[in-house]
Design a protein with these regions (language model features):
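Active-site-proximal helices and loops of the catalytic beta/alpha 8
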Residues: 147, 163-249, 254, 282, ...
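Active-site-proximal loop/turn and secondary-structure-junction residues that shape catalytic pockets
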Residues: 44, 97-101, 166-168, 192, ...
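Conserved residues at the C-terminal ends of beta-strands
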Residues: 12, 41, 67, 163, ...
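Short acidic/polar active-site loop segments enriched in Thr and Asp
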Residues: 36-38, 158, 290
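Residue-level preference for long, well-ordered alpha-helices that form the structural scaffold
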Residues: 19, 69, 73, 137-141, ...
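Loop/helix patches that line or flank the sugar-binding groove of alpha-linked glycan CAZymes
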Residues: 1-2, 48, 52, 215, ...
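Substrate-binding/active-site clefts of carbohydrate-active enzymes
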Residues: 1-35, 43-155, 173-181, 185, ...
Length: 357
C-alpha cells in the first residue's frame, strides 16, 4: 500500500450542494489526478447540543451509525462507495472514537461509557464545549466501537482514518484488527512528541507511534510537519525539520501531509510558486504516502471553515493540477529505500537529489 496517494474530502464543503452525489460526479477527475484512496471526513449526524457555529463540527458526532441528512441518504453513500470501487480506488471513513457530541445517543442508553471529571462528563485534556470524552479503557466501550467499524465495513468501506488515535486505548485497535482482518486500512492521526509528553505527565491515555504501528498501516507526519510550519513561519530552523524526518523514517510509515482541515493552506506560507513547488517535490520524494486536501491540487488558498457551510471555490489552475498529477504518477513508481537526508550549503540532499528549501 505504500507510495499511494490519499485525497481528503470534507463532503459538506466540497461543493455548493455539499452532498455525496456531487462528490460522485467528480470521481473521474479525482481518478485522473492519480488518487488511490479517498478519505472522507466524518459523515455522521452532528450533535445539536452546544454546537459550534451554524452547522457544527463533523467531529462532534451524535450517532455513529447514521448519515448526516445534509449529505444525502445511506443509499447515496453506498452508491458513492460502489463508484469509487468501480474506478479502481478505495474509500476510507474518518472515525472519531475519543469523544462524541454532548447529546450523542449513548448519553441516554449508556451514560457509563463516558469519562467523568468531578462527577460530570467532560474532557481528559482541554475543555471543549461541543464534545465529551468516551472512556475507551472500558471493555464494553471497546466492543461497541468495534461494532461501529463492522457496520461500515458491511457498507463497503475499505478502511478508516482514526481521529487522535494516540489518545484512544490501544485495545480498541487490537480488537478491531482481530475482528476486521488485515486487509482493512488503518490510518492514524498521531500527535507530536511535545503533546505526547504532556499527556504522559498528566497520566492521560497516550499510545506511542511505535505501539500504534503494530496494527496501523500508516500514521500522519505531524512531528516533522509541525517543525516545518514553525520553520516557514520563521519560528524554527531547517535542521529541526530534518531531524524530525530522520526520527520518523526508521520506525513508521508516514502520510506526508502538507495541509488538511486543521492547518492553513500550504500556499499561504509562500510568496512565490517556485518555493511552494520545491517543498511539494521534496515531500513527495520521501518514503510513505502522498496526501492531498481537496483543492490543494489547484493551489487554492482558501481553507473551508469547519463549523459552517463554506464550499471550496474551485479556481482550477490546470498547470498546478498537472504538476500534482505528474508527481502522483512518479509516486506510484517510487521504490522504498533507506533515505539519506543532509543539509549542505543551504540545500537539502535527499539521496543525493538537491532541494532548495
Amino acid at each position: 500500500m505504500k507510495n499511494q496517494v490519499i485525497y481528503q474530502i470534507f463532503v459538506r464543503n466540497y461543493s455548493k450542494e455539499g452532498t455525496f452525489k456531487k462528490v460522485e460526479e467528480d470521481l473521474f477527475r479525482i481518478k485522473d489526478l492519480g488518487v488511490d484512496i479517498i478519505y472522507l471526513m466524518p459523515i455522521h449526524e452532528i450533535g445539536v447540543g452546544q454546537r459550534k457555529g451554524t452547522y457544527g463540527s463533523p467531529y462532534a458526532i451524535k450517532d455513529y451509525f447514521s448519515i448526516s441528512p445534509d449529505l444525502g441518504t445511506m443509499d447515496d453513500f453506498v452508491s458513492l462507495v460502489n463508484k469509487v470501487h468501480e474506478l479502481g480506488m478505495k474509500i476510507i471513513l474518518d472515525m472519531v472514537f475519543n469523544h462524541t457530541s454532548p447529546d450523542n445517543v449513548l448519553i441516554d442508553t449508556h451514560p457509563e461509557y463516558y469519562f467523568y471529571k468531578n462527577g460530570k462528563r467532560g474532557n481528559r485534556v482541554g475543555d471543549w464545549t461541543d464534545i465529551v470524552d468516551l472512556d475507551t479503557n472500558k471493555e464494553e466501550v471497546q466492543d461497541y466501537l468495534v461494532s461501529v467499524l463492522s457496520f461500515w465495513c458491511q457498507k463497503g468501506v475499505d478502511g478508516f482514518r482514526f481521529d487522535v488515535a494516540s489518545m484512544i486505548a490501544f485495545p480498541v485497535f487490537l480488537k478491531a484488527r482481530q475482528a476486521l482482518g488485515n486487509d482493512v486500512i488503518f490510518f492514524g492521526e498521531c500527535i507530536d512528541h511535545e503533546f505526547g509528553n504532556y499527556l504522559k505527565n498528566i497520566n492521560s491515555i497516550y499510545v506511542a507511534d511505535e505501539e500504534l504501528m503494530k496494527v496501523f498501516d500508516c500514521l500522519y507526519n505531524y512531528n516533522w510537519m509541525h517543525q516545518m510550519i514553525a520553520y516557514l513561519n520563521k519560528k524554527g530552523n531547517l535542521e529541526d525539520v530534518i531531524k524530525a524526518i530522520k526520527e520518523d523514517n526508521p520506525i513508521n510509515i508516514r502520510v506526508n501531509c502538507l495541509e488538511n482541515h486543521d492547518n492553513s493552506r500550504f500556499t499561504s506560507y509562500f510568496n512565490d510558486e517556485s518555493s511552494y513547488r520545491e517543498w511539494v517535490r521534496f515531500t513527495y520524494a520521501l518514503n510513505g504516502y502522498a496526501f492531498i486536501y481537496m483543492g490543494q491540487e489547484y493551489g487554492i488558498k482558501h481553507k473551508p471553515e469547519l463549523f459552517e457551510k463554506d464550499p471550496v471555490i474551485w479556481d482550477k489552475n490546470e498547470e498546478m493540477f498537472n504538476f500534482y498529477k505528474q508527481l502522483n504518477f512518479k509516486k506510484h513508481e517510487q521504490m522504498d529505500i533507506k533515505q539519506d537526508i543532509n543539509i549542505n550549503d543551504g540545500l537539502i540532499f535527499l539521496n543525493e537529489k538537491a532541494f532548495k528549501l
